[in-house]
Amino acid sequence: MRRPPEAHYSFTIPSIHDDTTLDCRIYHPDTLAKPKDLADLAQWRRKGIVMAHPYAPMGGSYDDRVVGIVVEEFLHAGWMVGTFNFRGAHGSKGRTSWSGRPELDDYTSFAAFFMHYISCLRPRITSDLTFVPDQSPILSNQSESAPVQDDASPMVILGGYSYGSLILRHLPPVPTILQPFSAPIAGTAADEIVLRARKLADQSNLEWINLARDETRARRKSRAGNEPRPPVTMGGEETSPEKRRSSRDVRRSLEGGSRLEIRTRLRSLSHRRRHESHEPIPQPEKKSATTTMPDVRYLLISPLTPPTSTLAAPALIHKFWSRSKDDCQEVIGKHITLAIYGDQDIFASSKKIRDRSEQLKAEPNSRFTSVEVAGAGHFWHENGVEVRLRSALKEWETAIR
């Protein structure tokens, strides 16, 4: 039995839905985790994949076997991989919802974290980097933790298996995902997510700066710094407790401020005192956070179809595998997408997936592809099907890299 890959970072972030703590992992490929020299780092293109797990009440978590297969294949191919637990999965905080909407925000939270993290990485060590102990590596004439100015945007795959693919299919376009994180209110979950992404990116950048410094000093001789460092586990929060604000508090504050402003204006009109000035209502502090827009792709493994999908997330009634069109379907259809499924899946209709896949492929400028694996069930335990799953992932990765 293979030994599972070791996460480079294990940490938590709050969900933008209600601040529920989400357990997360980031895996670095060997090119980043154990580079032989600076040339390894310089050749790496920023590319990563987020993979969501199956239904938590049925044992789904980021330790799922099929999720692990995706982690292994993409790590081996040089991709960074991010996984997370939906609320209530594998002992995580909270509980699985009946609607699916909180889980949609859970995915959005981690996807935004992942995109900010990969945008802030600077694996290409250059001579204008300044190293200061106990501080982040800083580029000359560039602010700390700014996104990398690279020749190409990061490539990010948003993926999901089973229930994870159901949530994935309801995600809005990437610009919409990132919008709440562009100027987050200080102390909110969105602000906390951006801060954690930057802090972990700073830590990775510092590792590479140390490697560059060691290589310069040792002139490519053997050094202890080339040994793999132990994984980092990080909990807690980046914001101090007195400044941390829950998502509910922020919504209540903003709604209350709006109601107060309306009442003030009505009172002013009724007493004909328009000439009097009112003190402005203090607004929560906002921070600017920019990130590089990634080149996004989608990966769906064993996607659910009705009635299973309706039972798992009734509030996300979605007819992706039908003939009707909606915004979610358009998001998937307009990007490079792979759907892999088995023809013996007890939780999905292979005929529905097959028919709709052919329709999507036939549309103008379609970038949708699908692979149907004969004899494969939902859990990919049947004889020989894991090999075919891995093969399909390898072929697709080679085609899109």
Sequence positions of predicted segments:
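Alpha/beta-hydrolase active-site loop
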Residues: 96-148, 175-220, 230-238, 243-245, ...
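Catalytic histidine-centered segment of alpha/beta-hydrolase-like enzymes
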Residues: 58, 94, 376-389
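Short beta-strand element of the alpha/beta-hydrolase
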Residues: 38-56
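N-terminal cap/lid segment of alpha/beta-hydrolase-fold proteins
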Residues: 1-44
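Conserved alpha/beta-hydrolase
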Residues: 69-93
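Conserved alpha/beta-hydrolase "acid-adjacent" motif
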Residues: 307-312, 346-355, 381
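Short beta-strand/loop motif that positions the catalytic acidic residue
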Residues: 333, 338-341, 345
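The serine-hydrolase catalytic nucleophile loop
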Residues: 59-69, 350-351
